[in-house]
Amino acid sequence: DLGITFESSLMDEYHSCCNKCMFCFIDQMPPGMRDTLYFKDDDSRLSFLQGNYITLTNMRDKDIERVIKYHLSPINISVHTTNPELRCKMLHNRFAGDVLDKIGRFYEAGIRMNSQVVLCQGLNDEEELDRTISDLGKFIPHMESLSVVPVGLT
């Protein structure tokens, strides 16, 4: 132990989430809580360091290349659906549809991944869930897990 402590474990600014997911628990929190509870992180560094799940929508090419270059693994990905149009709708982000391309880049580089789906009845269940499971299964063995979590209200 060198006795050095940093104000932030990342030593620079955290990357906040740019999505407005229809199921986001942070957006459902009551007012008047401490500020840190309202911060929505979507930072690949926190995925590696602390196991946080990220949507990949904040990741630019240089961010993806950094993960690959330094083999920051595993990375935990909030997928929700592999249907590009539906993913854009669920995340309220018109740029969210390229998740399979990004996962493919990590796969080709041997980056280990875990994924999750927040299951919303009538949206990403049934055939859409089957499609997502099938699509993500193509990335085995580097796609190590898929968690399916039912949507909840806080």
Where are these regions (language model features)?
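Conserved Radical SAM active-site core
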Residues: 2-143, 150-154
